[in-house]
Amino acid sequence: MEERYGVMVCGHGSRDEDAVSEFLNFAKKLKNQLLQYELDWGFLEFANPVIKSGLDSLREKGIREIMSVPVMLFAAGHAKNDIPSVLNAYQAQYPELSISYGRELGIDLKLIRAAGERVKEAIEQADGDISPEETLLMVVGRGASDPDLSLIHI
């Protein structure tokens, strides 16, 4: 029997229904792009399903190799500590599984290009003339106490 691999998409979670919906839409689109893998998702906090539920689903489908990825822009406390703690606890509970952990999105040229394309789309859809020099794309997070984040400059 051919071994199947699973992908566990880990999100932060939010009390804002729109934020949860955006993550779920992203995860479902990703699932349609990665048809060679079983893919499930879960949130760390504030929303359901939780990460453990996604891991349960993969395990119940017979998946034994799970690649987990945090869908977060930067590596701070949640991506560095909290999600790995959930994964490690699950791994300890089910030692027959192999759970690996990827990295955060980070500053990547593809991400910057995608953001630039989105700005161009917004300019084209805007009423009236707006020059690129009059635009600004600002990404705002709640903030974090992780000292590594203060070192990031674009």
PLM feature segments, named:
Residues M1-I152:
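Active-site-proximal alpha-helix that buttresses catalytic centers in soluble enzyme cores
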